[in-house]
């Protein structure tokens, strides 16, 4: 009996986002659809366990058998709350399980508030593409992107971004379009282009916040 014909063609890579902290985040952005989800996770410090991390990496790479590239993508919540050692271990596991001829493409989406020289050096060493959540100049960014105490996060984000730029890390901007910045698109774009030197920008509209303006 002949084997089942290969009607799907050669193996293809796919993109899967992992959220190692679940919905847990150090910011309290009022438009975030994930804010109410944090209470659904067990305990007060939900974290992906190392045995689960290894199983995830192994299965992700096994599912890419024959594909030349494996996308390893991290999101949150805020994934950097896991700490740098978690991501060092994830890279070790990827290197362990990659098949001959395969390469890994690393991406992470972060609010940048916890980044420093050590994070930047790690991202550079392993060719991470880092997505930074930033909503424009200070007044527009801080309208919704605040910490748990209600204080704007702009200075922390710009500080984190400066570490990435100094290290030559490849990054892009993810900008949420909301009531505060929706009619100031040119200003936001020029800020990201000229002040942040962003080469790739995503604009994502949101709902769920007061359409008359920030509170």
Task: Give residue spans per PLM region.
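Canonical Radical SAM [4Fe-4S] cluster-binding loop centered on the CxxxCxxC motif
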Residues: 11-51
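Short, motif-level signal for alpha-helix interfacial/capping segments enriched in acidic residues
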Residues: 3-6, 52-56, 62
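Short acidic, glycine/proline-rich loop/turn micro-motifs
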Residues: 41-43, 142-146, 212-214
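Active-site neighborhood of divalent metal-dependent phosphoester/pyrophosphate hydrolases
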Residues: 77-78
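Radical SAM/AdoMet-radical enzyme domain recognition
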Residues: 57-73, 82-206
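A short, flexible beta-alpha/helix-coil linker loop
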Residues: 36-41, 139, 208-211
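Long, charge-rich, low-complexity alpha-helical segments
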Residues: 1-13
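Short structured motifs
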Residues: 3, 17, 157-158
């Amino acid at each position: 009996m002949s084997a089942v014909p290969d009607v799907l063609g050669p193996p293809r890579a796919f993109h899967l986002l992992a959220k190692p902290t679940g919905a847990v985040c150090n910011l309290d952005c009022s438009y975030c659809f994930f804010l109410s989800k944090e209470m659904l996770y067990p305990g007060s410090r939900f974290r992906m366990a190392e045995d689960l991390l290894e199983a995830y990496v192994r299965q992700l790479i096994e599912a890419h058998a024959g594909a030349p590239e494996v996308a390893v993508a991290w999101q949150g919540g805020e994934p950097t709350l896991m700490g740098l050692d978690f991501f060092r271990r994830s890279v070790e596991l990827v290197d362990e399980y990659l098949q001959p001829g395969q390469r890994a493409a690393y991406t992470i989406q972060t609010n940048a508030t916890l980044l420093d020289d050590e994070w930047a050096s790690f991202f550079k060493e392993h060719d991470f593409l880092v997505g930074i959540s930033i909503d424009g100049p200070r007044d527009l960014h801080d309208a919704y992107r605040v910490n748990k105490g209600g204080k704007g996060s702009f200075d922390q984000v710009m500080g984190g971004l400066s570490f990435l730029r100094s290290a030559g890390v490849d990054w892009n901007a993810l900008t949420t379009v909301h009531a505060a910045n929706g009619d100031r698109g040119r200003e936001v774009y020029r800020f990201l282009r000229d002040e942040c030197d962003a080469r790739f920008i995503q604009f994502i509209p949101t709902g769920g916040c007061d359409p008359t303006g920030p509170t």
